[in-house]
């Protein structure tokens, strides 16, 4: 995997399949919760340092301009670093905007290396959104949790983002089992002064190779979830725990972005979307993207067992402001049900599900769990990672 050809194949595949644009694997932080640490030796990952501008230009040609481009998002086998430590970051962003004038740019950043005085350059590149990995309420927590060498910067950056009206979301990897829940509340309090579109609080996941002091008990998930539910009413921005535990494919709304099309349409947290433009929805993912793709969609939904209807005023391929858990795409649903259907003819078809997903998969495939089908759902312990990441 060290040849130039192999490197380019890996990069181009990531760009083409996920619309992720890797530009660097260099981070300059050393977060105690980093998902790139403590991997089992069998895990295949790639780290490329700063990629050359000419190579990045070629990769940009493979982007789908109808979908957002993600920069700094660790969602593939490539180790993603901090975009704003790349020496050509503004050159890269300007080239993306020149090549694809309408593409939405989404950048995940620690906020440590994006200088507040450079924010006006980002404003000129809109549509652009940032996801700021805040992780703590003050510089001292950033030093402890992230080994941040510039811990003050993000607390100067966020007020500047609000001043320039640049859209941003924020995130926290919760280490409440080490720091207590009060540090989370203090982080929420800071953000309330400069509200993000949403705040995601990630339940930390560690492999069995991590230090024992870091590994978190499963019961802490419910403690964190209850804490967030209790605190939400005090804040103007949605606070969402990740991962979400879901039990069905019902297209339930988790929350809404303030002043969004979804909020203006009268939708609320807990509503279950059933139809969009009179077409049934099959999952949360299906509903979310059908609404995003449509102009002024008519939405049928269920609220406290009552069937209701509304129209959302928005343009095609524009965000609705809905916040929903990610479940299954139509393609995944069709593939899984096709295997279940085939078990009528084939011998002993098995679907292996993790413990958290077992009830969800069992409910989804319930029509096939009878004597007419040779289908079994197996519940499997996660012995490989031992965590949520």
Regions found by a protein language model. Name each.
Residues 7-51:
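Canonical Radical SAM [4Fe-4S] cluster-binding loop centered on the CxxxCxxC motif
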Residues 38-53, 63-86, 96-114, 126-155, ...:
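Core AdoMet radical
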Residues 66-72, 152-211, 224-241:
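Conserved C-terminal portion of the radical SAM core fold
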Residues 86-97, 125-131, 180-198, 253-262:
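Short, electropositive alpha-helical surface patch
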Residues 110, 352-358:
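Structural motif
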Residues 230-233, 246-247, 288-329:
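PDZ-domain C-terminal substructure recognizer with occasional recognition of PDZ-binding tails
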Residues 239-269:
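PDZ/PDZ-like groove recognition
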Residues 262-284:
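Conserved PDZ fold ligand-binding element
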């Amino acid at each position: 995997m060290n040849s130039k050809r192999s490197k380019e194949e890996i990069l181009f595949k990531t760009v083409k399949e996920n619309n992720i644009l890797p530009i660097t694997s260099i981070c300059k932080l050393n977060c105690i919760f980093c998902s790139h640490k403590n991997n089992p030796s069998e895990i295949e990952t790639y780290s490329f340092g700063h990629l050359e501008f000419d190579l990045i230009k070629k990769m940009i040609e493979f982007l789908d301009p109808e979908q957002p481009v993600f920069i700094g998002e660790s969602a593939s086998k490539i180790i993603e670093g901090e975009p704003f430590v790349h020496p050509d970051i503004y050159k890269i962003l300007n080239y993306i905007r020149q090549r694809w004038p309408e593409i939405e740019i989404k950048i995940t950043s620690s906020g440590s290396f994006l200088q507040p005085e450079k924010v006006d350059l980002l404003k000129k590149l809109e549509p652009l959104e940032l996801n700021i990995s805040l992780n703590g309420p003050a510089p001292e927590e950033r030093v402890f949790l992230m080994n941040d060498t510039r811990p003050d910067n993000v607390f100067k950056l966020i007020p500047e983002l609000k001043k320039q009206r640049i859209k941003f979301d924020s995130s926290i990897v919760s280490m409440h089992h080490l720091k207590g829940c009060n540090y989370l509340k203090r982080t929420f309090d800071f953000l309330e002064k400069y509200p993000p579109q949403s705040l995601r609080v990630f339940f930390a996941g560690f492999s069995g190779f991590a230090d024992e002091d870091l590994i978190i008990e499963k019961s802490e998930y419910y403690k964190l979830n209850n804490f967030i539910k209790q605190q939400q009413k005090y804040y103007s921005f949605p606070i969402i725990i990740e991962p979400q535990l879901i039990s069905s494919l019902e297209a339930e709304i988790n929350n809404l972005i303030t002043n969004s099309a979804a909020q203006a349409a009268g939708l609320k947290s807990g509503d279950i979307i059933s139809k969009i433009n009179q077409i049934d929805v099959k999952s949360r993912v299906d509903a979310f993207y059908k609404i995003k793709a449509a102009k002024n969609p008519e939405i049928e939904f269920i609220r406290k067992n009552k069937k209701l209807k509304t129209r959302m005023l928005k343009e095609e391929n524009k965000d609705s402001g809905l916040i929903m858990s990610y479940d299954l795409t139509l393609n995944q649903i069709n593939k899984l049900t096709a295997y279940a259907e085939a078990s009528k003819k084939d011998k002993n078809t098995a679907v292996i599900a993790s413990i958290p997903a077992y009830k969800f998969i069992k409910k989804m495939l319930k029509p096939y769990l009878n004597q007419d089908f040779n289908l079994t759902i197996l519940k499997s312990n996660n012995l490989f990672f031992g965590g949520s990441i």
